[in-house]
Amino acid sequence: MNEITTWRHVFKLDPNKEITDEQLEQVCESGTDAIIVGGTDGVTLENVIDLLARVRRFSVPCALEVSDIEAITPGFDYYFIPMVLNSRDLTWLIDLHHEAVKQFGDLINWEELFVEGYCILNDECKAASLTSARTNVTEEDVIAYARMAEHMYHFPIFYMEYSGRYGDVALVEKVKRTLERTRLFYGGGIHTPEQAKEMAMWADTVVVGNAIYTNLQMALQTVEAVKGKSA
């Protein structure tokens, strides 16, 4: 956990999206603190292994965010397990997690596994549809989910996921002020350095994903925006 607490900026790579070797090198050598491999659909064991092998040419830490049990493979530094707190489907609250432990319990290195308390806040994103997330939540609802993540479940990470939409900075601030030990991850709609810097004022870790595939050079600038010129 010690290394994860130092992460300020993370790039998320989707195994189901194309990225050239040159582009991948720019991402991995950008100064970002880590790479998370994960996606909502089209994630297979084959494309996860392929992307892992390509990322492993670089020294940047690499985590797999598990969305499909069949795509789990050894070789990552960390394994992030999303638990969607505002899902109406038990699959994303406990069933998948139970099945994963049933299949791989004897093989799991628990020091490498971290559960993320997810709160999906964009009703139009694929993740909300897939997980049957209740996205018409109030500010009080989100803060309650954050408190549950920290004080009831003792999750190391609370993840505010806007997935393609730039989120509510004021709400991110309020959630951050609520949390004491659990780290606040923010992801969604960051396409410019200015947006990244704004969210980094409150989020412990800013996750940049889609921008890699829409405007790579702008995405690369988010590293310095979050971490400063030493990145």
From Swiss-Prot:
It catalyses: sn-glycerol 1-phosphate + all-trans-heptaprenyl diphosphate = 3-heptaprenyl-sn-glycero-1-phosphate + diphosphate. The keyword Magnesium applies. The keyword Transferase applies. Pfam families: PcrB. Coiled coil: none annotated. It is an enzyme of class 2 (transferase). Sn-glycerol 1-phosphate binds at K12, Y159, M160, E161, Y162, S163, G164, G189, G209, N210. It comes from the Bacteria. Mg(2+) binds at D14, T40. Pathway: Membrane lipid metabolism; glycerophospholipid metabolism. NCBIfam families: GGGP-family, PRK04169.1-1, PRK04169.1-3. Homodimer. This is Heptaprenylglyceryl phosphate synthase. It comes from Anoxybacillus flavithermus (strain DSM 21510 / WK1).
